[in-house]
Structures are given as structure tokens and as C-alpha cells.
């Protein structure tokens, strides 16, 4: 969900070539939900294997990773750990939205209204118990690094950017900026939208605010830890409050204000080694078994893609070895 800054945050359109020779830290859960929304059948239903298990995330991860490698971009996928207690309310709100969408979908299905079926199906997104583990299994088989964050994935991504191990966070949300990420790129999963780059300095300097001010703006508007924020306050009004130094007048109306701010300013992150984020050789037979035998992907599509993945990773590792000599 994330904070809804919308058009109040300056962005600039970039090309995929602008990320060439760079490493990106991917907010995995955010992007996986994007795959669940976008990779669907004509009636809005997600892709499933013969056992009835949803496979849209595996499709998205496999082909998007190859797309990034083909554009000379190194991905590191970062998965959420245990969420802060304050986020439980957000999950309950999402559950209610999905329940209503499920009922609306069934009505549209009975009426054979394909357009409404597609609309409501995209709101039902949910992860099956083994989906995340299988996504990690797929990445390991592909030879692609991933990190398990202790808590929020965006915070871990931001930590990796600040460490110099990645150039930007890849996410549809703005939250990574609140954790101090210097750069976030949006729309990497969208085929019909330009990539959007948000740089923290290009946000703070023109607005003449600090990162603390940006966090306060987010809390006024509403975050995953205080859904809805303060009634009647959107991005423009929040900025006015901050610029006029009026934040203290609103703190008393914000439950758990200090705890929320501390989540953003002092997030839980995990240390990692260079080996943890290194590209490795793909397990070709393992990929065939997982994608084709276990999840019913078409061999005609998968086999050439596995071959391409192997070629791209070999080229990448060869280049890395060559660079280490100079």
C-alpha cells in the first residue's frame, strides 16, 4: 500500500538503458503483487498449474529477471521479514478489500461480465502459503541473489543503496525514500508506462525540507502504520503544514507518532557479504523441473529462455572476472 504522495513528489522519466551496468535492489513483495495483478487470463484469473496453485509470480520473476540481465542490469531481490506490529491493521484493511472484491467478482462471473471480472480480480491478490518460498527457490535455481530482510524489505533495499551495493530501489511504493534510499525507480514491471526515477535530493532541495520533514508529511497523509493519516490532509496540505512549522500542532492527534517515526528512522536491517549478493551459475535441470514439470510452463517458451539466462549469466560472470584484473 505505502504512503500516497502521488504527484507531490517530483519524478523524471528514464529509459531502461539508464540503468545499464547498474545493480538494482528489488522490493520483492511489492513487485510480486504487481505480477499477481498484471499476469492474468482473459477473465482476470491468475495463471495456475494443474494442481490449482497460482504461478503468476514465478512467470513474472523468471522473465523480468532475464529482461533485466539482457539490459545489463544486475537484480538483487529483497524479501520482507516480520512486519512491525503497527502494520497488522493495514493487513486487516487489505483483507476486507479482498473479501469485497471476491464477492463482486463472483457476481460479475455469474453475469458473464468479463470487464468487471478483470477489474475485481486484480483486487483479490493474495499469496498462497508456499508462494514466497517457491519464489526464493526459483531465484536460487536461476543463480540470482536474494536477501531476507529482518522486517521491511524497502528498509533493507535502502540500506543496500546507502552501502553502495546497489544503485536504486525498484518498487511501486514511495516508502523506500522514507527509509533514506537515495533513488527509487517505479514502473519496471509495467510495459505501457515509462520508468520513473525519484531521487531524494531532487525531492528535498526544491521543497526546502529535510528527510525528517518528509517522514512527517507521510505520517500526516497516512502510512502502513497509521492508515489514512489525519482526515482531510493530503500531500499539498501536509507540505504546507511542514513549511509553516506547524507539525507539533498535529502530533497529539497521531496515535503512535514516535513509534512510527522510529520505524522509518531506525529500521531493522541485516548485514550481508559480497558472496550473498553475487550472481551464480543457474541450475538448468532444476529450472526445467520446477518450471515445466512442477508448474506446467510451456517447454517451447521455457527452454529457449533458460538457455538465454545461462548465456547472459556466463557473460556477466566473465565480465566481472575480467574487470577484477584491472
UniProtKB/Swiss-Prot annotation:
List the protein's name: Flap endonuclease 1
Taken from the UniProt record, the cysteine pairs bridged by disulfide bonds within this chain are none
Keyword list, A-Z: DNA damage, DNA repair, DNA replication, Endonuclease, Exonuclease, Hydrolase, Magnesium, Metal-binding, Nuclease
- Region I-domain: which residues? 116-245
Q: Carries keyword Transcription?
A: no
Matching SUPFAM superfamilies: 5' to 3' exonuclease, C-terminal subdomain (SSF47807), PIN domain-like (SSF88723)
HAMAP family in UniProt: Fen (MF_00614)
Entry binding sites for Mg(2+) 2: 173, 175, 224
Q: How is the cofactor bound?
A: Binds 2 magnesium ions per subunit. They probably participate in the reaction catalyzed by the enzyme. May bind an additional third magnesium ion after substrate binding.
Organism source for this protein? Methanococcus aeolicus (strain ATCC BAA-1280 / DSM 17508 / OCM 812 / Nankai-3)
- Protein residues bound to Mg(2+) 1: 27, 80, 152, 154
Oligomeric state and interaction partners are given as: Interacts with PCNA. PCNA stimulates the nuclease activity without altering cleavage specificity.
Q: What does this protein do?
A: Structure-specific nuclease with 5'-flap endonuclease and 5'-3' exonuclease activities involved in DNA replication and repair. During DNA replication, cleaves the 5'-overhanging flap structure that is generated by displacement synthesis when DNA polymerase encounters the 5'-end of a downstream Okazaki fragment. Binds the unpaired 3'-DNA end and kinks the DNA to facilitate 5' cleavage specificity. Cleaves one nucleotide into the double-stranded DNA from the junction in flap DNA, leaving a nick for ligation. Also involved in the base excision repair (BER) pathway.
N-domain, as annotated region = 1-98
Q: Which GO biological process entries does UniProt record here?
A: DNA repair; DNA replication, removal of RNA primer
Where are the residues of the annotated region Interaction with PCNA?
318-326
